[in-house]
């Protein structure tokens, strides 16, 4: 979580609230449990969440300008890749900091393709960088464990991806790890702006940042941060929580001196809500040496319940079709020539649809087809790297990397 001046925050918030949504969507009415959603929520593992937080705090620091943050980036990329998610990419960006053009680690984006509305995206994310503003010294050697801020949120996104990557959905899902949040929401701002510039249809953005601290003796609460324009999206969240965890207090809250990546999406015209621990009694240990498991993350039950609800909300909004996926090894597909520049041939199972996506996740070509060998005209595509995706007659999904000269 980023802290900054209250006056600047209120000025920025006023500007944010004037923005208009790029797209309008209806949200599900959740008045009774879906047994499939409940089954997925029940599979959320405290042990898995704990292991992720423990691993992330084991890096000396995840500060944006240190070598270690690149190691975390690569670890996230490899973790998503092992899940078999359709597309995993590194989103690179540059930014001005202290009047100097800077680079840092990339945003890590994993995209799971929807089968019915692949161009509509449900996005969830958490920043993976950390910061220590208390201990003096060389940034490369000052520990910034960042357990609650924000290994806890990252663990929730990874756990959501671990379970939902085995399912099929109507809409596409993006699981995101943001870089450089602690110095101004830099990574998420770059990505959200790029999405808006390309008119990417984001149905809603869920942000997890600090979900593991519960003050001793205080009743557990989930506080939601959102602007009034996003009340319809927030109402979906309230209703979902009431249906699936009625004992949990869920209400709107604000922090006078802090912000997080949901604001990047608000600013660019997308509905976004931040799921957070108690806004008046959040961890006092963030940005210090003591942001560690057992001190700053002291309630794995809270982290588990927040993640369960987050997973269920994402799955419901994405439109759960089935709770298992069939084998989608790229060996089932042959593409030649690859790299290509004009026409190419796709061979595989009995195909009914071929789609091509750029690395932003946008669909740039779609062909309805029948047969196990299809010729495809790609002369209109700009040079670059793409993902070719095939849906067969049994609704199995296969993907393969495609290079256009």
Task: Name each model feature, range by range.
Residues 90-91, 214, 218-322:
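Active-site-adjacent substrate-binding region
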Residues 51-113:
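A non-catalytic alpha/beta surface segment that caps or lines the substrate-entry region
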Residues 104-106, 139-232:
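Acidic/histidine-rich catalytic neighborhood of metal-dependent amide-processing enzymes
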Residues 319-336, 342:
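Residue-level detector of functionally pivotal "anchor" positions at catalytic/ligand-binding pockets or at interdomain
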Residues 357-364, 386:
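Short, glycine-anchored, charge-dense loop/turn motifs used at functional sites
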Residues 1-25, 323-325:
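Bacterial Sec-dependent N-terminal signal peptides
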